[in-house]
């Protein structure tokens, strides 16, 4: 593995263990040239997935991009990183087990919305605002009006706490 600090190809694995949810192997590495230490994660990839964007363009699936978009929605929310990681891993497993190699981006958005709805109500609304392309305050109002059940009451409870 190439060192991210100096580019040297000669690195050593110092520690290797499964992640808590057993979906990856975490490896601590050491560069013999510069002494830098870094962590890598090794995951099973069942198949190469291609995402079909709304404009028809096809791009390779990027798990890190999915994780970044979820983390943006979760920013400053009281949810443990491990729960976020589990949700993203679950989405990736569902995508890989669908049997399709080409997945519409709307399907990923739908799966993220499902996951966030049970994880954090505010993050759910944040993600929805991008996924559904909210343009005005009334878009938020309409969306919040559509919500019913535990998620809607959870959002109303948070609003009353302020």
Curated annotation (Swiss-Prot):
unnamed zinc finger locations on the chain: 3-34
Function of the protein: Negatively regulates transcription of bacterial ribonucleotide reductase nrd genes and operons by binding to NrdR-boxes.
Alphabetical UniProt keywords: ATP-binding, DNA-binding, Metal-binding, Nucleotide-binding, Repressor, Transcription, Transcription regulation, Zinc, Zinc-finger
Cofactor note as given: Binds 1 zinc ion.
Keyword Ligase: no
Domain of life of the organism encoding this protein: Bacteria
Species this protein is from: Parvibaculum lavamentivorans (strain DS-1 / DSM 13023 / NCIMB 13966)
Ranges of residues in domain ATP-cone: 49-139
Family: Belongs to the NrdR family.
Gene Ontology biological process: negative regulation of DNA-templated transcription
Encoding gene, per UniProt annotation: nrdR
Biased composition annotated in UniProt, kind: Basic and acidic residues: 11-21
A GO MF label: DNA binding
Cofactor requirements of the protein: Zn(2+)
Record protein name field: Transcriptional repressor NrdR
Residue ranges of the region described as Disordered: 1-21
